[in-house]
Amino acid sequence: MAMPTNHAILSASSSHRWLECPPSAKLCAELPDTSSEYAQEGTDAHALCEHRLKALLGRETTDPTENLTYYNEEMERCAVEYATYAYEQVKKAKVACNDPIVLIEQKLDFSRWVPEGFGTGDCVIVADGTLSVIDFKYGKGVEVRAENNPQMMLYALGALELFDGIYDISAVNMIIFQPRRDNISEYAISKEELLRWANEILTPTAQLAANGDGDFKAGKHCRFCKVRATCRKLAEYNLALARYDFEPPATLDNIEIAAILAKADELVSWVTDVKEYALRQALSGVSYDGFKVVEGRSNRKYTDENEVVEAVKSAGYDPYEHSVLGITAMTSLLGKKKFNELLGGLIEKPQGKPTLVSISDKRPAIHTANEDFKEEK
């Protein structure tokens, strides 16, 4: 979804949070929105996707690239991949329906279930019996899944509001297209299942959230919450690990270590957020017992690189480093096709450094030395 400039209190993009923790919605609404480079980059990518898809469909469109701050070859490639994929979905829809409806960047109103609820669907395809909603995600930090994704389900409800009376829709397809994670995630649900969820779970929870009622609940949904640094429930949730009732003996057993690992990343992230929040507050005049603000370490830098170059050259030395461009920079220089032609046979991908992750991670487990030894025996 493109980043809207005006947010509803109960937005689709934050629904994963307020459905789990209803009172967080009003608390977050009281704080100002803060933009980031990642958010602006995503906005640029969505604008380019819209243009590329409209062009494929033969619709009137204006190339936005000269106005995109973060436009680069990777963004272009991702936009073309998205447009091509969405266009293929349109062609599939035409097999079942001669003239499917295709909406791009369509405002979707789901306020029948969520007070003032609306969002923007990147691509909505409506054909006889089937509604498809495609959402483009440019982020690469977290892989987004379509299965039981509340944001996608809200978009689907908004699309049903527009078209269910015109088309006899019975099935809903929800698709996440996330090219920088090589992730295309699909989830199909019947209209009846979607409406049952909307009436039995969504509506009552949304009403609680709109009123600031309900119980606070900490969990993975807290990751992008605006009040996570000062939330008491999240603090209790994370500090519970510090109060873990470790039993003798003096060393932890595997079960205790697994319990710590399950929360370690969230704990580290939360502590970082608290420290950043405290620094901002301290810089604005807040005092914390036992702490003070000091000047951090800094590195020396040249005041004028051009003068440095001239001075070093005049002394008879070469001021520049000389090394082969890295793979990403070389791909940008040559283009992906030329890069593969010239250097495809000279590229290898060594094994990655072993890392311990949750069992839910999609990557296959590697064989440890101990397992190999057991197999040999």
Segments the model singles out, each with a brief description of its role:
Residues 40, 98-207:
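Mg2+/Mn2+-dependent nuclease catalytic core
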Residues 243-298:
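Contiguous, amphipathic alpha-helical segments that mediate oligomerization or scaffolding
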Residues 286-377:
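Charged, polyampholytic interaction/assembly segments that form long, compositionally biased interfaces
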Residues 173, 199-265, 370-377:
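Short, charged, low-complexity amphipathic alpha-helix
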Residues 53-57, 138-141, 156-164, 207-210, ...:
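Hydrophobic/aromatic-lined pockets within catalytic cores
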Residues 1-131, 171-173, 264:
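Metal-dependent nuclease catalytic cores that hydrolyze phosphodiester bonds in DNA/RNA
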Residues 65-74, 221, 228, 279-306:
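Charge-rich, acidic-biased intrinsically disordered regions
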Residues 34, 38, 143-145, 253:
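Alpha-helix N-cap/helix-initiation motif
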